[in-house]
Amino acid sequence: MTQPIIRSIPLHVVSNDHPSSSPLQPGVKQSGEDKIGRSPVQFADVPVLRKPSWIRVRIPSGNAVQSLKAKLRENRLVTVCEEAACPNIHECFSHGTATFMILGEVCTRRCSFCDVAHGRPKPPDPEEPISLARTVAEMGLKYVVVTSVDRDDLRDGGAQHFVDCIAAIRQSAPQTRIEILTPDFRGKGRMDRALDILAACPPDVFNHNVETVPALYPNVRPGADYQWSLTLLKRFKAQHPQVPTKSGIMLGLGETLDQVQATLRDLRAHDVDMVTVGQYLQPTPHHHPVLRYWTPDEYKALEEYGMALGFSHVASGPMVRSSYHADHQAKEAGLGFNATVSLGSPAVSSTEHRERNTIASKSASKTESIHHR
């Protein structure tokens, strides 16, 4: 694989000189400048890179997006697609698929890449598992991804709420395959508690994203630990060898090819089965800047590198996100099911999936994004 040419753009982390503010009230959101401006990680100005043609996103016609949003509001549900301003939201919503975000809309972390609001979360909604299960059943979803904000305020990191959601979905929609995309459950005794709880009702796919290479963690994921995330993935797999494990990384934050390849090797060495690799897009001018746009050919080369390492599936492309076409990723990895939805749109083939990662459309959506957790 040819070593990519990386533009020499200095990234300076500057100290946070914001005065301490009064404690936040539960549920109050900090986003954009309000969120990042109070983070211990601040970024000096760097040149803004022009988005290449392969980063354009198609905005489909029709009212499927609005219909799905209405159903979500009716059941008081949140999708990470909306909260994180994902660039694929129009495509996924128009196909009747979504990644549901449980445990509220406020995260206890201030990751510099993420557009989800920071603050002091409200207590978990005990009715949310039932509302989620009802929506999944009404939509006729055959595959659903459930993720959450970080909940460092909870002793189990929210693991019991995940289990309650899994159990409720299986009760209301027993044919639905369930992938969970979890936080890291970091904290004294928290991983142990979370894994014990998840053992009572494990998902069909367990996903936890390492997000970036370890050298960039202080700037990208303050409050997280690379080895902790790897350990979580390995320990879950050891407890549930029959459940596929999955992780994902973003590119464009200043990583090198050698670092990316080393991270892929680390994931495989920790028994991760599937991996996603996609381009980081800056949600707001206050977030971590994009330092490089990797080309479609480079993503293809990383896909080949990952498959040679022994992953059962590698989704690698500029617009790939952890839960983007997650049903097809799982199907290609050997998890058998009929990946169709009830809203009338045909499932997208894996060939179409790969093609869409390299085709530029005439219109671009708001390309703020998160690879999410």
Swiss-Prot record:
Limits of the Radical SAM core domain: 93-312
Cofactor(s) the protein requires to work: [4Fe-4S] cluster
Example of a GO cellular component annotation carried by this entry: cytoplasm
UniProt catalytic activity: [[Fe-S] cluster scaffold protein carrying a second [4Fe-4S](2+) cluster] + N(6)-octanoyl-L-lysyl-[protein] + 2 oxidized [2Fe-2S]-[ferredoxin] + 2 S-adenosyl-L-methionine + 4 H(+) = [[Fe-S] cluster scaffold protein] + N(6)-[(R)-dihydrolipoyl]-L-lysyl-[protein] + 4 Fe(3+) + 2 hydrogen sulfide + 2 5'-deoxyadenosine + 2 L-methionine + 2 reduced [2Fe-2S]-[ferredoxin]
Cofactor remark: Binds 2 [4Fe-4S] clusters per subunit. One cluster is coordinated with 3 cysteines and an exchangeable S-adenosyl-L-methionine.
Binding-site residues, [4Fe-4S] cluster 1: 81, 86, 92, 323
Alphabetical UniProt keywords: 4Fe-4S, Cytoplasm, Iron, Iron-sulfur, Metal-binding, S-adenosyl-L-methionine, Transferase
Main location: cytoplasm
GO molecular function per UniProt: 4 iron, 4 sulfur cluster binding; lipoate synthase activity; metal ion binding
EC id: 2.8.1.8
Binding site for [4Fe-4S] cluster 2: 107, 111, 114
Pathway per the UniProt entry: Protein modification; protein lipoylation via endogenous pathway; protein N(6)-(lipoyl)lysine from octanoyl-[acyl-carrier-protein]: step 2/2
Biased composition (Polar residues): 358-367
Positions of region (Disordered): 14-36, 346-373
Location in or out of the cell: Cytoplasm
Pfam families: LIAS_N, Radical_SAM
Family: Belongs to the radical SAM superfamily. Lipoyl synthase family.
PANTHER family according to UniProt: LIPOYL SYNTHASE, LIPOYL SYNTHASE, MITOCHONDRIAL
Protein name (database record): Lipoyl synthase
Lineage of origin: Bacteria, Pseudomonadati, Pseudomonadota, Gammaproteobacteria, Lysobacterales
